[in-house]
């Protein structure tokens, strides 16, 4: 139901009412240089690091880690409100939607219908049209179900959503999603929460070369060097959650990730030296004593 129709809509016998809010799912100082902004769906950001809000010990730690990361976009999951205990803390009390861009996601959805319904609820609850779509294949791998992802993306785009999409590291699928109208392609580096890093850097690079919309590595980052590798491959950004939230010191790891993203981006822009089979001395031989 659209918010604009609330006043004139009456509940009938047997109707069910769902009240939802946003939960953790998935330092604004020292951002990326102003001359190298990250742009998605016409929105401009300083930071190329996107962070999830789940798996932390509490909301206080969540807020401190996000602040240290420098991220401006935070992913949130949509869940039913516990109306029996309204005193329970809520994410919005700690992570201000006026300060950060909330990116509602479909974490936990295994069908296109579930994903579409979840994001429609998110739009009604918060008014957000920029969303992250993920349709999972099974509980064991949380690998993307691409058939259902295509169906959900088509329905959401038709409904006016701007879709950032979690997908397999498949350049053909990525191109199809771009052609459908997705505003960002988000291939997994490795399985969600695995910390295995980027298993197939070659296919990530192929995806980057195949599409013109932003490409962000989503899932699998375990430590700062993984984030730097993603950026050195030419990716436009990285989304992560577990690597920060499950670190021994999440706030310190968040800062490490911020620096890794910046270092990887600068390295990509600078261009690495060519690989050589044999040695090449740094000091000139002319004038050797």
UniProtKB/Swiss-Prot annotation:
GO terms for MF: thiazole synthase activity
CDD domains: ThiG (cd04728)
Active-site residues, as the UniProt record annotates them: 132 (schiff-base intermediate with dxp)
Gene3D superfamilies according to UniProt: 3.10.20.30, Aldolase class I (3.20.20.70)
The protein's annotated pathway: Cofactor biosynthesis; thiamine diphosphate biosynthesis
Pfam family, one: ThiG
Localization, UniProt: Cytoplasm
InterPro entries: Aldolase_TIM, Beta-grasp_dom_sf, Thiazole_synthase_ThiG, ThiG
GO cellular component, as recorded: cytoplasm
Catalytic activity as recorded in UniProt: [ThiS sulfur-carrier protein]-C-terminal-Gly-aminoethanethioate + 2-iminoacetate + 1-deoxy-D-xylulose 5-phosphate = [ThiS sulfur-carrier protein]-C-terminal Gly-Gly + 2-[(2R,5Z)-2-carboxy-4-methylthiazol-5(2H)-ylidene]ethyl phosphate + 2 H2O + H(+)
UniProt similarity note: Belongs to the ThiG family.
Summary of the function given for this chain in its UniProt record: Catalyzes the rearrangement of 1-deoxy-D-xylulose 5-phosphate (DXP) to produce the thiazole phosphate moiety of thiamine. Sulfur is provided by the thiocarboxylate moiety of the carrier protein ThiS. In vitro, sulfur can be provided by H(2)S.
Alphabetical list of PANTHER family matching this protein: THIAZOLE SYNTHASE
Protein name: Thiazole synthase
Gene designation per UniProt: thiG
């Amino acid at each position: 139901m659209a918010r604009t129709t609330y006043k004139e809509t009456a509940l009938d016998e047997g109707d069910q009412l769902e009240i939802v809010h946003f939960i953790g799912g998935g330092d604004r100082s020292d951002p990326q240089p102003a001359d190298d902004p990250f742009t998605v769906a016409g929105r401009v950001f300083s930071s190329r690091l996107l962070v999830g809000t789940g798996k932390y010990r509490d909301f206080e730690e969540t807020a401190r880690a996000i602040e240290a990361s420098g991220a401006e976009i935070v992913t949130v999951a949509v869940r039913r409100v516990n109306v029996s205990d309204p005193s329970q803390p809520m994410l919005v009390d700690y992570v201000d939607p006026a300060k950060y861009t909330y990116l509602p996601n479909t974490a936990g959805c295994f069908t296109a219908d579930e994903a579409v319904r979840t994001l429609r609820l998110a739009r009604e609850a918060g008014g957000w049209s920029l969303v992250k779509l993920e349709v999972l294949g099974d509980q064991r791998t949380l690998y993307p179900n691409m058939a259902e992802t295509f169906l959900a993306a088509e329905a959401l785009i038709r409904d006016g959503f701007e879709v950032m999409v979690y997908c397999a590291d498949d350049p053909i699928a990525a191109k199809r999603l771009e052609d459908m109208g997705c505003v960002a392609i988000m291939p997994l580096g490795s399985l969600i929460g695995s910390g295995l890093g980027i298993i197939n850097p070659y296919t990530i690079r192929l995806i980057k070369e195949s599409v013109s919309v932003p490409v962000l590595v989503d899932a699998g980052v375990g430590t700062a060097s993984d984030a730097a590798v993603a950026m050195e491959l030419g990716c436009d950004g990285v989304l992560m959650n577990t690597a920060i939230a499950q670190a021994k010191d999440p706030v310190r790891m968040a800062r490490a990730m911020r620096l890794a993203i910046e270092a990887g981006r600068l390295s990509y822009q600078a261009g690495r030296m060519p690989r050589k089979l044999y040695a090449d001395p740094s000091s000139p031989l002319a004038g050797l004593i």
